[in-house]
Amino acid sequence: MRKRSFGVAAGLVTAALVLSGCAGGGGDGAGGGGGDDKPYIALVSKGFQHQFWQAVKQGAEQAAEEFDVEITFEGPDTEADVDQQLQQLQTALDKGPDAIGFAALDSQAAGPYLQQAQDAGIPVIAFDSGVDSDIPVTTAATDNKAAAAEAAKHMVELVGDTGKIALVVHDQTSVTGIDRRDGFVEYIEENAPGIEIVDIQYGGGDQLKSTDLAKAILQANPDLKGIYGSNEGSAIGVVNAVTELGLEGKLTVIGFDSGQAQIDAITDGLMAGAITQNPVGIGYETVKAAVEALDGKELPKTIDTGFFWYDATNIDDPEIQAVLYK
């Protein structure tokens, strides 16, 4: 159905949402697309291969239940498949949803599709990763530059203010990839000019590819003091490379996101720490924003869903446990 006005119940994203546990990955979330008596919101994410997206889906489903709307939740097979994601976005548009949530793999490529949505009067909510467009009515996401700067701050604290480090980043086309790279690099340049960033590689968020890239970096730079992985797949790839080369305890690894593998790596001392987002909150706030847009409410241009640094010293704190996803 289209442009149905309905009231929005008050609701805040709390730790209870996350503590309820993550649903398994898959194609559709609640509902199947455009029921007769509920507004329909189509969500197109960046993928399903990481536990992060399963947690985003869970938050979206919780909001759908709370606000009595129907949603679908889809994403490409990998976070490198921009073409598949755009096909899914077109399919979502063809269903005539009341609103669309979109997490862009490429911040520029989706422009014509977003224009279709605007021309059809379909409000677009960007989530996790924004786009180079003013068409989305809001973006629900982590402040990725600030989060990456926080990761860099801890890198400096751990390796000192001199030496060589490197980055394995998930991509250089999405806003998240760009911001998590630039936020980290800019902090190092401004606050620790004695640290040299010897390499930045892009692994598409793929764990195996990131492992190979990290191994090549480590073999080319035996005096490396630290590596930063910018998302779940990148960070675990770095951990795997360190383990396979027998370099445990010889350099500092800092990650981004959560997931059981990173939690285990921190607990086991293979990773110094990581930034965790609030993925359930991202999914929840995306659906909530769509509901409010359909009800004619004015939304802020960004909805900051927050981030936290976690390591072995605070991983069991209730505040951290509430935003870790497994």
Please annotate each region the language model reported.
Residues 2-8, 17, 22-326:
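A residue-level marker of the well-folded mature domains of exported/periplasmic proteins
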